[in-house]
Amino acid sequence: MFDFSIITSWIHQTLTSVMPEGLAVFIECVVIGVCIVALYAILAILLIYMERKVCGFFQCRLGPNRVGKWGSIQVLCDVLKMLTKEIIELKHSDKFLYNLAPFMVIIASFLTFSCLPISKGLEVLDFNVGVFFLLAASSIGVVGILLAGWGSNNKFSLIGAMRSGAQIISYELSVGLSILTMVVLMGTMQFSEIVESQANGWFIFKGHIPALIAFVIYLIAGNAECNRGPFDLPEAESELTAGYHTEYSGMHFGFFYLAEYLNMFIVAAVAATIFLGGWMPLHIVGLDGFNAVMDYIPGFIWFFGKAFFVVFLLMWIKWTFPRLRIDQILNLEWKYLVPISMVNLVIMVLIVVFGLHF
């Protein structure tokens, strides 16, 4: 498996040899930031196109097929259209909060995105409390959503924001308990160590039944945190027009739209990292030839392949199940998922204490 830290170390040494170390670090930070923004934009375009095609498939139609080959540049045209849209200033809104909200949502998404271990040696933020930082950074987004609902001075926006706040805060508990269950098995919160410790088997298989239960609960709760169907009550168009982004237009609306898809990818990427081995290839005990071939596939291909597989599962859920009521959503969390997650955590602790895992 190729280690990208060799390249990054060489770049750092080259820069520090021709300029002061502080300036070199500043240039590296700028380049990393530009790369994250570029990857963020590319992933958003791919995910939106994938969503439209998957939606078309489940509804027995073609999806976008006019602009470009197989509709491949339809999303780019939509981006250009959105860039030319006017950002409307509301007369009686709280302008500061109204304008701040989209940036808080997108910044929370960026911070969380920067934690993802794309390949060996290719992590922007890799420290010993990475899982804790990811959970903390992802919680910032709910503040932006609440500000959007309040600052818009619109009853539909406020109701949508309150629904979203209740939903995200509730389901964060199940996400946290599911990840904590796996942290007990993993013994670390550093993402690079989490992936490397799965070289001899992915945690979804090593943790017995509790790991599978944690994976299912994580997918359900992660889907709800992203406000994706069937948990899309905050933007239920039949009753709230567009929820908390009703009054937004132009790139302000675009930021919310981007954040939704990238948050879905982050949920999928974290699932791929913690449960499915991240950038670690598939190894089967006793099949040395097969394992050697798998090692030739670059780590980032494994990472994105697993992440997009989980994204497909999330899209499948959205376009299969009908929308739930807000009371059903909260009942599912507090009466079922939280108790099951807590019992599951205790079972995992017992498995680890008595050494019953693989």
Curated annotation (Swiss-Prot):
The UniProt entry's sequence similarity note says: Belongs to the complex I subunit 1 family.
Residue ranges annotated as transmembrane are 30-50, 96-116, 129-149, 168-188, 201-221, 265-285, 297-317, 336-356
UniProt xrefs under Pfam families: NADHdh
- Quaternary state and interactors: NDH-1 is composed of 14 different subunits. Subunits NuoA, H, J, K, L, M, N constitute the membrane sector of the complex.
Q: Which gene encodes it?
A: nuoH
Describe its membrane topology: Multi-pass membrane protein
Give GO terms for biological process.
Answer: aerobic respiration
Catalytic activity from the UniProt record? a quinone + NADH + 5 H(+)(in) = a quinol + NAD(+) + 4 H(+)(out)
Q: Which UniProt keywords apply?
A: Cell inner membrane, Cell membrane, Membrane, NAD, Quinone, Translocase, Transmembrane, Transmembrane helix, Ubiquinone
Spell out the protein name for this chain: NADH-quinone oxidoreductase subunit H
Provide the organism lineage as a comma list: Bacteria, Pseudomonadati, Bacteroidota, Bacteroidia, Bacteroidales
Stated EC number for the protein is 7.1.1.-
Q: Any idea where this protein resides?
A: Cell inner membrane
From the Swiss-Prot or TrEMBL record, what is one GO molecular function term? quinone binding
Q: Which GO terms describe its cellular component?
A: plasma membrane
Q: What does this protein do?
A: NDH-1 shuttles electrons from NADH, via FMN and iron-sulfur (Fe-S) centers, to quinones in the respiratory chain. The immediate electron acceptor for the enzyme in this species is believed to be ubiquinone. Couples the redox reaction to proton translocation (for every two electrons transferred, four hydrogen ions are translocated across the cytoplasmic membrane), and thus conserves the redox energy in a proton gradient. This subunit may bind ubiquinone.
Q: Which organism is it from?
A: Bacteroides fragilis (strain ATCC 25285 / DSM 2151 / CCUG 4856 / JCM 11019 / LMG 10263 / NCTC 9343 / Onslow / VPI 2553 / EN-2)
